[in-house]
A protein has these predicted regions:
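Binuclear metal-dependent phosphoesterase catalytic core
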Residues: 13-34, 138, 213-266
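Short, flexible loop segments at the rims of nucleotide/cofactor-binding pockets, characterized by
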Residues: 16-19, 43-48, 74-78, 159-164, ...
Length: 266
């Protein structure tokens, strides 16, 4: 019995190493037709080849009309932003790139913040901080909003107890009323999916949870806030005719939860 347990443990360790060093998956979700969106999220300090070329090549093969980066392109402790910059440049050659800050961009160590902002200024992504951009693709006009919520929804007083709660009214204060038409909302934190839908976004693209880090039988284990079994961790969640689209992301250690790029057809 011990012999079998040792073999299982060795196989588990080998798979863990393989998953975290070599795997990169593409998940495709067909929600409509006419526009292809590539969703990249939560890279953190992970690297996928020289200049993150594996990510760029996978996205290129999908021929997207739009590329979304839903936060945590870097980690708060990062000092070398050249891999992130190379990724931005590579993606921009494929399609328009829209991005938002995640909780890590909001809390980058002060000594590195200037270098990070300079890196962004050299590139041509469209950074949305409680702002909106309009894009016409295949005769359809999309209004793309980027939400920068209060950091208290992620961490408060150095911990994860009594976090701030985001309501529809808070979103309206930050973004204004949701307009008519096709509205995409980029919001790093998926836990407020119902509120995003109430605000009126047809599609909300989120990340943050890393798919739950560890997944068993398709269920997420843990959120970054140290909460077990997070409700919105990976996949498509319906709120009437509105949808929350959550990527499991690319970075951080994970098990039975491969790094992913997501392609949505809407």
């Amino acid at each position: 019995m011990l012999y079998i347990a040792v073999i299982i443990l060795i196989l588990l360790v080998l798979y863990f190493i393989y998953e975290n060093l070599f795997m990169l998956t593409v998940r495709r979700e067909k929600l409509g037709s006419g526009i292809r969106i590539a969703h990249v999220s939560d890279l953190h300090k992970r690297r996928f080849g020289m200049n993150n070329e594996r990510i760029v090549e996978r996205v290129k093969a999908e021929k997207p009309d739009i590329i979304i980066i839903s936060g945590d392109l870097v980690s708060r402790s990062e000092t070398d932003f050249s891999p992130a910059e190379a990724l931005l440049k590579g993606l921009h050659e494929l399609a328009p790139v829209y991005m938002i800050y995640g909780n890590h961009e909001q809390s980058i160590y002060r000594e590195n913040l200037r270098a990070f902002k300079k890196m962004l200024s050299r590139n041509q992504e469209i950074l949305l901080k409680n702002g909106c951009a309009e894009l016409t693709v295949n005769d359809r006009t999309l209004k793309i909003y980027g939400l920068l919520e209060d950091y208290g929804v992620y961490k408060k007083n150095g911990g994860y107890r009594k976090l701030e709660v985001l309501k529809e009214s808070d979103i309206e204060k930050l973004l204004g009323k949701c307009p008519d038409g096709e509205v995409l909302l980029l919001a790093h934190n998926p836990f407020f999916g119902e509120e995003y839908a109430k605000w009126g976004a047809k599609y909300t693209l989120s990340g943050h949870v890393h798919g739950g880090s560890v997944r068993f039988f398709g269920k997420a284990l843990l959120s970054p806030e140290r909460r077990f079994f997070p409700k919105y961790a990976k996949g498509v969640y319906d709120f009437g005719d509105k949808k929350l689209l959550v990527s499991a992301g690319l970075g951080k250690l994970r098990l039975f939860n491969p790094p992913e790029i997501v392609i949505y057809e809407i």
